[in-house]
């Protein structure tokens, strides 16, 4: 039954399933937790929707190539991390969230100061939504301690090269 609460929850569940960052059990646990706190949606309907959406995604995945753009993106971000980048995927829901996550990651107490010496790059959920709509994936980037705009431009070039290196078209 599509009322506002059900429609909102349906949209979030669909996004989380297609983003691919959470196991089905984690999404189900999150749905249960939202219901337990009284979020006002129809729990059986949302659970049925989640099951059907997972089946739909599995059918789509069966048609995907062995190496997907997501796999290539993982490799590019791992490569950048190896070069001293703070490379974060799904860094919140907005650009501001992403910058905050980068700052938290770089400045965490258990992170050696020499770990993130080069730059940072990230994307957030709105960027993933655009990618799922075939509008491309935006990746934010910059130098961790820029002396000039050229430092940030150089980081952009490194991100571009890493994406190109794994076969993505930046």
Task: Write out the residue ranges for each language-model feature.
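Structured alpha/beta or helical-core interaction and ligand-binding surfaces enriched in interleaved
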Residues: 57-114
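Short glycine-rich, low-complexity/disordered patches
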Residues: 25-33, 47, 87-96, 162-170
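N-terminal leader/presequence regions that precede the main folded/catalytic core
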Residues: 1-35
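An N-terminal amphipathic alpha-helical segment
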Residues: 100-138
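A short, surface-exposed helix-loop junction/capping segment
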Residues: 52-61, 138-144
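Repeat-associated, polar segments at repeat-unit boundaries in modular proteins
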Residues: 33-58
């Amino acid at each position: 039954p599509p009322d506002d609460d059900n429609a909102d929850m349906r949209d979030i569940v669909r996004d989380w399933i297609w983003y691919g960052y959470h196991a089905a059990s984690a999404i189900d646990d999150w749905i249960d937790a939202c219901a337990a706190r009284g979020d006002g949606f129809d729990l059986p309907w949302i659970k049925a929707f989640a099951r059907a959406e997972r089946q739909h995604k599995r059918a789509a995945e069966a048609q995907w190539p062995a190496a997907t753009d997501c796999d290539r993106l993982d490799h590019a971000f791992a490569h950048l991390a190896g070069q001293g980048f703070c490379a974060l995927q799904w860094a919140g829901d907005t650009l501001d969230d992403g910058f905050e996550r980068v700052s938290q990651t770089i400045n965490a107490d258990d992170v050696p100061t020499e770990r993130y010496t080069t730059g940072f790059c990230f994307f957030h959920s709105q960027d993933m939504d655009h990618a799922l709509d075939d509008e491309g994936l935006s990746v934010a980037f910059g130098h961790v301690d820029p002396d000039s705009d050229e430092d940030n431009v150089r980081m952009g070039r490194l991100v571009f090269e890493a994406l190109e290196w794994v076969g993505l078209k930046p």
